[in-house]
Structure formats: C-alpha cells, structure tokens
C-alpha cells in the first residue's frame, strides 16, 4: 500500500499533474503500473481519510497546548515509530514544521498504513503528504521538502 501512495504522490500530486482524475481511470492506471487491487483500494481509502482533514470532516485529537507538556507514545505507536522516528517528530515540532495538530495527523496516518516495515524515510514521506494536504501548511511543507531532499542529495555525493 505504501508503494501505491508513493507512486500517487510522485506521479499525480507532487508533480502538480491533473488532480481531478477519474477514480476508475486512476485505479486502471495503478493496475497497469503493476499494483495489487487491494493495495490500490487501501491507498485510496488512506488518501480519502487524509482528505477528510483538509475538508474539515475529521479533526485531530484535541490536545493540551501547554508548551511544557510532552507527548507520550502508546505501545502501538512505539511499535510503528521507532526512536529515530519519534525523535524526528520532536525535532520537527521544535523547528515548527509540525504543530500539535499536524503531528497527531501524521501519527494517525502512520498507524493507518498496513505495512509491516516502516522507517524514518517512510515517515518523512508521510509527513510530506500530510502537510501537502492541510491548508495553511504551505511553508511547513516547503521546509519539510527542503529537509527531505537536502539530506537525500547529500547522500549521493
């Protein structure tokens, strides 16, 4: 499913291709690209839930906004988000790429993925997808994009 999301993000969303694609055509394109129907369905459902945030149909968990409070992760969250992922989320909060609400949206979308393996690079892409879909997060999205591509470009040298 995550591969389908990555393909969609890179092919349709991130490249600013026509976003209003017929769902049947999209499903056919994904099938032609070699993706499994169940993965396609799950990825589209995942994106629908993400779009609910954008449209105001879903709200992230309401949290105390005390700056001295600290997020305690559940065992399920710790299982999916290792220490490096949790540290990266904290880092993004500290540099104000994420706020309390967007952090919770990211965690919720990560837990909704049906993938056995999940690492820091995957988390970065989920964060990018969430920020791209939330109105008012354009600057945060741009910062996250710079962080993601700057680090990856440095690895190529």
Swiss-Prot record:
Ranges in a coiled coil: none
InterPro entries on file: Smg
Any Pfam family matching the protein: DUF494
Family of the protein in this entry: Belongs to the Smg family.
PANTHER family for the chain: PROTEIN SMG
Protein name: Protein Smg
Name of the gene this protein is made from: smg
């Amino acid at each position: 499913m995550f591969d389908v999301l990555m393909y969609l993000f890179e092919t349709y969303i991130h490249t600013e291709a026509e976003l209003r694609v017929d769902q049947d055509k999209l499903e056919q394109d994904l099938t032609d690209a070699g993706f499994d129907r169940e993965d396609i369905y799950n990825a589209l459902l995942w994106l629908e839930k993400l779009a609910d945030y954008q449209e105001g149909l879903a709200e992230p968990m309401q949290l105390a906004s005390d700056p001295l409070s600290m997020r305690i992760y559940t065992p399920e969250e710790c299982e999916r988000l290792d220490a490096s992922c949790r540290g990266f989320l904290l880092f993004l909060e500290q540099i104000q790429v994420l706020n309390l609400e967007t952090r919770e949206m990211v965690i919720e979308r990560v837990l909704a993925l049906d993938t056995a393996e999940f690492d820091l690079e995957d988390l970065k892409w989920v964060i990018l997808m969430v920020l791209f879909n939330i109105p008012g997060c354009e600057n945060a999205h741009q910062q996250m994009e710079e962080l993601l591509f700057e680090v990856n470009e440095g690895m190529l040298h």
